[in-house]
UniProtKB/Swiss-Prot annotation:
Keywords: Ribonucleoprotein, Ribosomal protein, RNA-binding, rRNA-binding. PROSITE patterns: RIBOSOMAL_L6_1 (PS00525). Disulfide bonds: none annotated. GO terms for molecular function: rRNA binding; structural constituent of ribosome. NCBIfam families: L6_bact. This protein binds to the 23S rRNA, and is important in its secondary structure. It is located near the subunit interface in the base of the L7/L12 stalk, and near the tRNA binding site of the peptidyltransferase center. This is Large ribosomal subunit protein uL6. It comes from Streptococcus thermophilus (strain ATCC BAA-250 / LMG 18311). The keyword Transport does not apply. Belongs to the universal ribosomal protein uL6 family.
């Protein structure tokens, strides 16, 4: 039994859902998202509540039930509130700047890294060492933030690199002399 899959999704004001043969479109104040769901999951929209049902308790249907509900809920939250990931940079000379929709990063390499914003994603640079990635699609926001982090992930000896705000970086002790 999927406990997450059985939860009811309540639609906030201004959000509407259309289900066309398991291709679900969610419209809200921040935008519109469309996603195709598995044919075995039945999506019912009743008033301002959405429920997902599976035809039987086969292993395949159980695994997809909770995931489908979580994906649909993320779509509803995305078009009503949006998602954001905050990153911070640690290191001498590490800085970020915005050039149009492009994020230009100086992270201790011989060249600057440029990251083009994917469709639906916006970058903000509140200070030279912090980056905010925001958008309505949770998956794309997370993937973009992870890509930026991968350009210079935090190293354990000095802690230099790009990390999520609040991320704990395990530190190691350096080599000891004789």
């Amino acid at each position: 039994m999927s406990r997450i899959g059985n939860k009811v999704i309540t639609l906030p004001a201004g959000v509407e859902i259309t289900n066309n043969d398991n291709v679900v479109t969610v419209k809200g104040p921040k935008g519109e998202l469309t996603r195709e769901f598995n044919k075995n999951i039945e999506i019912k929209v009743e008033g301002n509540e959405v429920t997902l049902h599976r035809p039987n308790d086969s292993k395949e249907n159980k695994t997809i039930h909770g995931t489908s509900r979580a994906n649909l809920n993320n779509m509803v939250v995305g078009v009503s509130e949006g998602f954001k990931k905050e990153l911070e940079m640690h290191g001498v000379g590490y800085r970020a700047q915005l050039q149009g929709t492009k994020l230009v990063l100086s992270v201790g390499k011989s060249h600057q890294d440029e990251v083009e914003a994917p469709e639906g994603i916006t970058f903000e640079v509140p200070s030279a060492t912090s980056i905010v990635v925001s958008g309505i699609n949770k998956e794309v926001v997370g993937q973009t933030a992870a890509y930026i982090r991968s350009l210079r992930s935090p190293e354990p000896y000095k802690g230099k690199g790009i990390r999520y705000v609040g991320e704990y970086v395990r530190r190691k002790e350096g080599k000891t002399g004789k």
